């Protein structure tokens, strides 16, 4: 093995850039010649590693910021553009939950594409899940309780205390949710990431199955011609006339309310002026009476006058009180009329709201009837029949036979098709790429559908609850929904995609349970939605026939 002495100097050749050595006669020290190559290789590897880590961190941070900005924009410009949410922490909570949720899906796609450093991808995945768990289990519920207690007018210290008590009760109930369900393969301790994610997944999976059961029935219902109701133009015209007539009545009654309030204001101004004049007269009589009593001992000739003067004040007060009672009785009549008119206006506005809804639904029904006569509408009609039967059958078979995720649907379908046509194609390679595309489409569709659903829920209940409470509820449901989506995707995707990033961290979770629970909730949700739509269809038909 070549060695270098301690005085060997490594220098670079100015012309060729090579390495030359200067030997000396000193004793050799046994330093291997490849040590320098190892050092250079280590430094190069460290620099490459540092560059990879820096780019990985930059990608994660920038993507999180972009998701946060998109969530903030969606919050202000779409979801709550007609409502006022003054709490900045509420807006931050929604946007952060939205960004963390989308980052979960982003990391799954990066795992499929083998993008970013693998070790740091694992760390970011664990970091994201930990933040989501803390946010959904502790932060959002506590602030929700804080706003609810604060609305009752308690002091800040009492509000913090009662909110903490409610949070403890909530945590006990939340932890008890997972006891009846086999969410873990083995016990991992009282508090662990798997325990929290597993319980979050139960609630999120329930919400997902309810929405899916509703959508699986309502979408075919929208296209199947059997459920379409005949709509006459005469019916729409009649309802529009009633709507316009009610609008005129509302306008006239509101005009009367404005005139009565103006008249009431004028009378109040006149009453205040009269009160000031009467008060001055009453003070003058009292002052005159007091002066006369003070001069009683000095002027005995005025005793008769002084004895009569005290009677003037009480008599005037009685006359004033009688007049004031009559005046207030006159004022109460316009007030009663205003209250009666406001009640009538509210009834008419409720009637108009119902009429507007009926007109809108009838026009949509007429558009659906026109669409059903087209070639595309007929195709959607048969497609609606197919999916309405297929999804219920698939869920029922999964429950009855306890089917678990094996080969993913894309690989199975591609394998059957290629065997039938006798094509020699790498099924595993192409199924992975097709699965990746379908997973992306499925994720985008799921996010879009969920955002539309929470938009409908907010507009439905925003008048009965505080906007801040609605935002926190939606943020919590959204986070649970996305976590349960990841758990559901674990058994639907090929194992090679999620073997490291999902199974490595959440390996103790019983993923197949969530599919069975989804099917168990999906079927009742679909059946209830079917019965509700049939009942609504018949009731609306009877209503139209009555008109």
Curated annotation (Swiss-Prot):
Annotated GO biological process: cell motility; endosomal lumen acidification; protein secretion; regulation of gene expression; sorocarp development
Molecular-function GO term, any one: protease binding
Record keywords: Glycoprotein, Membrane, Transmembrane, Transmembrane helix
Segments of this protein annotated with the region Disordered: 268-305
Subcellular location field: Membrane
Record-level GO cellular component terms: endoplasmic reticulum membrane; Golgi membrane
Major localization listed first in the record, in broad terms: membrane
Glycosylation sites: 290, 299
TM region positions: 56-76, 92-112, 134-154, 164-184, 200-220, 427-447, 469-489, 517-537
Chain coiled-coil ranges: none
Mode of membrane association: Multi-pass membrane protein
Similarity remark: Belongs to the Golgi pH regulator (TC 1.A.38) family.
Name of the protein in its database record: Golgi pH regulator homolog
């Amino acid at each position: 093995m070549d060695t270098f002495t301690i005085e060997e100097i490594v220098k670079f050749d100015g012309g060729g850039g090579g390495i030359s050595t200067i030997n000396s006669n000193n004793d050799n020290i046994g330093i291997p010649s490849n040590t320098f190559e190892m050092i250079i290789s280590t430094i190069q590897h460290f620099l490459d590693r540092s560059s990879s880590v820096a780019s990985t961190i930059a990608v994660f941070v920038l993507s999180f910021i972009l998701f946060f900005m998109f969530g903030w924009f969606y919050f202000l410009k779409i979801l709550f553009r007609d409502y006022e949410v003054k709490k900045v922490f509420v807006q931050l909570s929604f946007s952060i939950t939205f960004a963390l949720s989308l980052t979960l899906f982003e990391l799954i796609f990066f795992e499929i594409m083998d993008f970013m450093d693998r070790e740091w991808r694992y760390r970011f995945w664990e970091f994201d899940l930990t933040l989501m768990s803390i946010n959904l289990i502790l932060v959002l519920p506590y602030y929700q309780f804080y706003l609810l207690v604060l609305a009752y007018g308690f002091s800040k210290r009492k509000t913090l205390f009662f909110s903490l008590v409610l949070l403890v009760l909530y945590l006990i109930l939340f932890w008890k949710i997972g006891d009846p369900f086999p969410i873990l393969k083995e016990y991992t301790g009282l508090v662990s990431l798997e325990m929290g994610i597993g319980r979050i997944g139960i609630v999120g999976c329930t919400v997902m199955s309810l929405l899916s059961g509703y959508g699986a029935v309502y979408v075919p219902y929208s296209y199947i011609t059997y459920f379409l109701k005949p709509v006459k133009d005469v019916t729409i015209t009649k309802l529009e006339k009633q709507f316009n007539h009610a609008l005129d009545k509302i306008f006239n009654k509101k005009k009367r309310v404005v005139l009565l309030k103006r008249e009431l204001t004028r009378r109040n101004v006149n009453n205040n002026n009269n009160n000031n004049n009467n008060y001055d007269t009453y003070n003058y009589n009292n002052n005159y009476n007091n002066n006369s009593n003070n001069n009683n001992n000095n002027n005995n000739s005025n005793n008769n006058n002084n004895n009569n003067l005290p009677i003037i004040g009480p008599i005037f007060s009685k006359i004033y009180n009688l007049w004031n009672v009559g005046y207030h009785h006159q004022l109460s009549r316009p007030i009663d009329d205003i209250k009666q008119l406001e009640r009538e206006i509210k009834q008419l506005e409720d009637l108009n709201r119902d009429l507007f809804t009926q007109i809108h639904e009838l026009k949509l029904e007429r558009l659906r009837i026109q669409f059903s006569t087209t070639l595309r509408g007929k195709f959607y009609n048969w497609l609606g029949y197919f999916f309405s039967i297929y999804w219920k059958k698939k869920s029922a078979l999964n429950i009855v036979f306890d089917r678990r995720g094996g080969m993913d649907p894309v690989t199975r379908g591609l394998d059957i098709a290629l065997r039938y046509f006798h094509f020699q194609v790498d099924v595993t390679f192409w199924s992975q790429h097709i699965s990746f595309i379908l997973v992306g489409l499925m994720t985008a569709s799921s996010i879009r559908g969920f955002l539309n659903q929470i938009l409908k829920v907010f507009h439905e209940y925003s008048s009965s609850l505080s906007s801040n409470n609605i935002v926190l509820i939606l943020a919590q449901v959204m986070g649970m929904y996305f976590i349960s989506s990841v758990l559901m995707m674990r058994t639907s995707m090929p194992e090679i995609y999620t073997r490291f990033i999902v199974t490595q961290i959440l390996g103790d979770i019983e993923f197949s349970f969530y599919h069975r629970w989804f099917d168990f909730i999906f079927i009742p949700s679909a059946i209830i939605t079917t019965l509700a739509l049939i009942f609504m269809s018949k009731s609306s038909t009877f209503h139209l026939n009555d008109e």
